[in-house]
Amino acid sequence: MSANTYMQQYKKATVEASGPEETLILLINEAVRSAEASRLEQDAEKRGQLLDKARRIIAELSSSLNMDYGGEVAFNLLRLYIFINRRLADAMGGETDGLTDALRILRHVQETWHRAVEIARESAAAQG
């Protein structure tokens, strides 16, 4: 088996063994990584693939929001995800400001999710 195949199997096993919080963190990290990598990519086709990957991840995060349970927080996240996807689409069209905007918001969302999961773990540990 190639190193790439092993890596794909490792990633799949990691996601399958993760809880929803860890899966969310893995996804948002990968969206940020793909968007950042697209900035450095010289090949237009590969850059487009990286941006498309980030867009698909954000679309998946959007579709997983529970609007009934999440209320205003879920609605605001949906609005952020829509904005990020729009700006990534603009970046696919060659607009460099689109990628800058998308990455700025993506990093903020990433940081917020990391902190939220950390707080939830601390709270769970304190309760027993």
Please tell me what each predicted stretch does.
Residues 1-37, 46-53, 59-66, 72, ...:
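N-terminal intrinsically disordered, cationic/polar leader segments
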